[in-house]
């Protein structure tokens, strides 16, 4: 059984025009040539929303290399416009990202590295807005969907042909409507887990690309406890296992969504104010290291992380290490840190 030793190895560099980085959530994220690529995301530089703070989305994209447990910034560039909450997909030596360009269209970005410098090419556009969906590349097609398309959650999974630049609806997801699900390609199949809407979801499904068939997978239940994967991220632990970190507490989430959507007037304002001022521990976000065995379709857990449980972070896997990068640690409060664990 794995024992992961987590170390805080640094703070992400400030965005252009800022004195320091307070952290962002909803990141562009991936690994190219064993180097970390992440950026964009959103935060609240002016403080909590109940104190007048407003959400700011950022343009900065970072290229980091980790040498001797030291984080080395190789490159920092700005995209043409701010990006956040779009899906990322690693494929070979490239990273794909779907970026909302305006209120009716998105660009498909292709990120590469040359001479330790980031390059961004816009390789296509689609007449849809895409947020908090999944994305994976298989057989030169970028699959995306099962999340917010044009502002509404959809079960549709689209495929975008990277060669012909055409896209179509591939299939319909069999689970409930949701956003922020997790995805992974394994043995010619698409694995989809979690996400949420008014409630969190712990169910999983497998889509076999060639047969175009969905099957149900094991729910995220360990020691008789059902874990929420909403807001969590996962990455490759080894050839047959994925590591999951973070995620909202299912009961706290459901209660908050219910009250914020049903209370009115002074009661709503009072609850909202108290909600954002709660201490981190009151939100009970998941600190357990969950492990999904792709081969056996089983869930287990290792230990607990030794830092605040994140949501909307980047969990990235290189050859030898795993990195948890930024994210939020409670609603509207972010973390600027990079944490590292050896596999």
Predicted regions and their residues:
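Kelch-like beta-propeller repeat domains
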Residues: 1-343
